[in-house]
Amino acid sequence: MGLRRCTHFATLVMPLWALALFFLVVMQVPAQTTSLQISKEDRRLQELESKMGAESEQPNANLVGPSISRFGDRRNQKTISFGRRVPLISRPMIPIELDLLMDNDDERTKAKRFDDYGHMRFGKRGGDDQFDDYGHMRFGR
């Protein structure tokens, strides 16, 4: 009787162990390969962007070739994922709505401190009629 119970228990436990092994090993491999594909794709995109940035700094860079090849490569890639991949967009630290509500005095003070050429104005006192942009007194105007 004891041997029969042991074999009956083994027949119940073995499929459970096989199922657990299937989920741990077989189901992990596609998830790891998709994550590796995504990381390789991200790394390749970063390299392409850095190359595009280096080419844009050159005066006679041909920008049509790399962009066409990049879109061609992206079209041939097939990524299996659970949803649509959303591209990462760099966002400002302050949301747009809050930025509109905030009073930025920097622009006004910057306009007062610098002229059109980026030179700092010195000696700017009260009236604009009396002194020019460089702090020199105006005569005869």
From Swiss-Prot:
Record's subcellular location: Secreted
Entries under InterPro entries matching the protein: Gastrin/cholecystokinin_CS, Sulfakinin
Segments for region (Disordered): 49-69
GO biological process: adult feeding behavior; adult locomotory behavior; inter-male aggressive behavior; larval locomotory behavior; multicellular organismal response to stress; neuromuscular junction development; neuropeptide signaling pathway; positive regulation of cytosolic calcium ion concentration
Record's signal peptide: 1-31
Phenylalanine amide: modified positions: F82, F122, F139
UniProt superkingdom: Eukaryota
Keywords of this entry: Amidation, Cleavage on pair of basic residues, Hormone, Neuropeptide, Secreted, Signal, Sulfation
Propeptide, residue positions: 32-73, 86-111
GO molecular function terms noted in the UniProt entry: neuropeptide hormone activity; neuropeptide receptor binding
Pfam families: Sulfakinin
Entry's family note: Belongs to the gastrin/cholecystokinin family.
Protein purpose: Drosulfakinin-0 (DSK 0) plays diverse biological roles including regulating gut muscle contraction in adults but not in larvae.
Name assigned to this protein: Drosulfakinins
Organism from which the protein derives: Drosophila erecta (Fruit fly)
Lineage of the species this protein comes from: Eukaryota, Metazoa, Ecdysozoa, Arthropoda, Hexapoda
Encoding gene, per UniProt annotation: Dsk
